[in-house]
């Protein structure tokens, strides 16, 4: 339902106004509504940290731009666990590292590390 980092939050488009206010006050970040690849539960469709956002591979360019604007980081497309598009279902990431499902392939790991800033 919520995709957030230290700079902003991107949330389910139908989230009630009261919930938006709670997120703004709790996280102290601006909040924008939207979806990714027609997935309204954006926290399932993407994973963010303070360096980047890995998004559902069918996310459209305008959706990526909206996420980049909301979270103030670069967004890219990717998958996990041998092609699963709902990256938030099997990837947890912070600024210091990540944990991903054991079926994730080498190329998928490379995309995760590049997008989320774990490659120097």
State the predicted function of each range:
Residues 1-120:
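The feature marks the mature, well-folded catalytic cores of soluble enzymes
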């Amino acid at each position: 339902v919520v995709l957030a980092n230290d700079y902003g939050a991107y949330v389910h488009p139908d989230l009630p106004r009261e919930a938006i206010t709670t997120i703004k006050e709790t996280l102290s970040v601006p909040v924008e509504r939207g979806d990714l690849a027609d997935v309204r539960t954006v926290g399932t469709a993407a994973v963010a940290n303070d360096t980047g956002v890995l998004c559902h591979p069918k996310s459209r360019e305008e959706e990526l731009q909206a996420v980049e604007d909301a979270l103030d980081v670069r967004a890219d497309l990717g998958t996990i666990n041998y092609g699963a598009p709902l990256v938030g279902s099997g990837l947890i990431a912070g600024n210091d590292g990540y944990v991903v499902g054991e079926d994730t392939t080498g190329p998928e790991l490379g995309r995760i590390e590049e997008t989320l800033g774990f490659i120097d």
